[in-house]
From Swiss-Prot:
Pfam families in the record: Tubulin (PF00091), Tubulin_C (PF03953)
Protein's UniProt name: Tubulin alpha chain
Lineage: Eukaryota, Viridiplantae, Streptophyta, Embryophyta, Tracheophyta
Function: Tubulin is the major constituent of microtubules, a cylinder consisting of laterally associated linear protofilaments composed of alpha- and beta-tubulin heterodimers. Microtubules grow by the addition of GTP-tubulin dimers to the microtubule end, where a stabilizing cap forms. Below the cap, tubulin dimers are in GDP-bound state, owing to GTPase activity of alpha-tubulin.
Site feature: Involved in polymerization: 451
InterPro entries cross-referenced by the UniProt entry: Alpha_tubulin, Tub_FtsZ_C, Tubulin, Tubulin/FtsZ-like_C, Tubulin/FtsZ_2-layer-sand-dom, Tubulin/FtsZ_GTPase_sf, Tubulin_C, Tubulin_CS
Gene field: TUBA
Species: Triticum aestivum (Wheat)
Amino acid sequence: MRECISIHIGQAGIQVGNACWELYCLEHGIQPDGQMPGDKTVGGGDDAFNTFFSETGAGKHVPRAVFVDLEPTVIDEVRTGAYRQLFHPEQLISGKEDAANNFARGHYTIGKEIVDLCLDRIRKLSDNCTGLQGFLVFNAVGGGTGSGLGSLLLERLSVDYGRKSKLGFTVYPSPQVSTSVVEPYNSVLSTHSLLEHTDVSILLDNEAIYDICRRSLDIERPTYTNLNRLVSQVISSLTASLRFDGALNVDVNEFQTNLVPYPRIHFMLSSYAPVISAEKAYHEQLSVAEITNSAFEPSSMMAKCDPRHGKYMACCLMYRGDVVPKDVNAAVATIKTKRTIQFVDWCPTGFKCGINYQPPGVVPGGDLAKVQRAVCMISNSTSVVEVFSRIDHKFDLMYAKRAFVHWYVGEGMEEGEFSEAREDLAALEKDYEEVGAEFDEGEDGDEGDEY
């Protein structure tokens, strides 16, 4: 088996996790108490969904997941929520006092007390796997726990499970919507370790997802539940090929192989289509070509950056539902002829496609319509650098005055870590610039000849 262990850190990680596990359960027909009436092989078996769920002798399906937070309120919601019987109590780890939006508390003072317990639980889960494939890590980098404890856990996972791939689903601060003043500090410090300790990192930001909810689902005031349900569709599409059998399956390691040209250039944009409300879906049926086009629309991107400002290095299209390879090839061929979608010249093919015949599931009473086919795109584009340069700029404004720095130093950090992390990000911006600029040397007028 190729099992994956999910690790949900901090409030954002846990709430996205709730949405994901709810959706997985619906897709596999697993009840909130973990029973699965449709499962023929009780107590084990080699079903595809066993990559994400382990089975007990009594036929209960338990998620291979750990939820960690430094304060109890968010995890208590899981403990008392609809899916409380699904999780093993040991999988829900909460501390007593939170990180107070402070990276240093999450990484040094409070975080280090809880990190061994987490690793112990993760070790138990991994002992339960026959062929652990890797980790999916969910966190946000604006707060204290997601950024501080998140990077601490990633660092320790690298030590304990060096060769296993780590996929990060990371919520980055939005340009306009901010939840804390020190977001830029936490993000920069955290990205410093994401750079080294994740293999692929998928960037999400709330503002972009708010806009998608407003525009495509006509929700005037989207809540976090609305956002998380949309994010969970993306994550479900990515992991569908691990959980179901399909025509063109995609392994976790394949993301890395196909999307990451250089180790540091591993921050991805994601988009999902069709995002469509039930009222609209009733009247229209979307073709493969249409959903593929809308996945490339700048407005579909789940992070606030415009792919037209950069070049694509590679992208991965995961289709699910009623889709055949012939349609996919035609849709991709059309995309390649578009002048607005530019690829770097050293990566002429640039497309990795996966097809899964299981149609996308939806949460009953949710906002998304049940559709016959959907596509999720993960793309590596040089425009991601916009996300970093925005955060770096805000970081510089605050750090020039050393504002709020004493809170970090007081928790045992050194000021040098700030400048070290900031330099690392400056180097990252430069890396992206070089990767995108490699073709301006010899070609001035004939950029279109790579097709």
